[in-house]
């Protein structure tokens, strides 16, 4: 049966995902940046309260995946922290200036991760040569690759995802970006074994007093009074679709 991973941005969201049938959580901070390394406090609380597998993302900033020496040093420290806290896996990825996997740096990450299952995230979708990259990741011992098939969403990239799945000795290919209940059957019918979804919605803040003339964001038009949360009903719906597909 296909595995359902839910992207979560808080302990509360991780618990919601767990309670509604998620098989695994990718734990992140900063949804508007596409996911950054969670704080130590969030990592510890999730480790304490969430019982399904949780893989934190290790990503020090938004933007590209070519990092300075200082940023890479932080990545290695965060990998060691996640390992010491007892998480079963993590999510990360590093490219060089030419859009290839930065093999020397990824080798250091894999050494620091030790027995943890490492997912190479959507840095894969920004690489120059996906098939060569897939071979490099297999050589590194990467457990899985999260990808939209190098398109803006995974449904558009499904043909590339199927090509990657067919690649000899490839890691597990997990489809992500725009995967929802309404299109999930396309991925299941194509033989995708793992799917990744935010299954989320914007939730209004409980704040009654609101200073509408001030923003804490560099975007003056950003909504300070909403947050992105996992929709438990959406998770349950996706899990049900997977189970019914398996029963066919």
Curated annotation (Swiss-Prot):
Keywords: Cytoplasm. Its main location: cytoplasm. InterPro entries: CutC-like, CutC-like_dom_sf. It is found in: Cytoplasm. Pfam families: CutC. Gene3D superfamilies: Copper homeostasis (CutC) domain (3.20.20.380). HAMAP family: CutC. NCBIfam families: PRK11572.1 (NF008603). Belongs to the CutC family. Homodimer. This is PF03932 family protein CutC. It comes from Shigella boydii serotype 18 (strain CDC 3083-94 / BS512). The gene is cutC.
């Amino acid at each position: 049966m296909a595995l359902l991973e839910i992207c979560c941005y808080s302990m509360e969201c991780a618990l919601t995902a767990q309670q509604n049938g998620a098989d695994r959580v990718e734990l992140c901070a900063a949804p508007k940046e596409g996911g950054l390394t969670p704080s130590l406090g969030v990592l510890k609380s999730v480790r304490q309260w969430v019982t399904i597998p949780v893989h934190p993302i290790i990503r020090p900033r938004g933007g590209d995946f070519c990092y300075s020496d200082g940023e890479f040093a932080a990545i290695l420290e965060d990998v060691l922290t996640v390992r010491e806290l007892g998480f079963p896996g993590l999510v990360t990825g590093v490219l060089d200036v030419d859009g290839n996997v930065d093999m020397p740096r990824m080798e250091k990450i894999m050494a620091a991760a030790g027995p943890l299952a490492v997912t190479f995230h959507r840095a894969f979708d920004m690489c120059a040569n996906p098939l060569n990259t897939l071979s490099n990741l297999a050589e590194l011992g990467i457990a899985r690759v999260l990808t939209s098939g190098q398109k803006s969403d995974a449904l558009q990239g499904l043909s590339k995802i199927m090509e990657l799945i067919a690649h000899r000795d490839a890691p597990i290919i997990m489809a992500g970006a725009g995967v929802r209940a309404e299109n999930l059957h396309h991925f299941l019918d194509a033989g995708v074994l793992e799917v990744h979804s935010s299954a989320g919605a914007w939730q209004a803040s409980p704040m009654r007093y609101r200073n509408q003339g001030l923003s804490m964001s560099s975007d003056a038009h950003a909504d300070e009074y909403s947050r992105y949360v996992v929709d438990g009903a959406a998770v349950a719906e996706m899990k049900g679709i997977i189970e019914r597909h398996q029963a066919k």
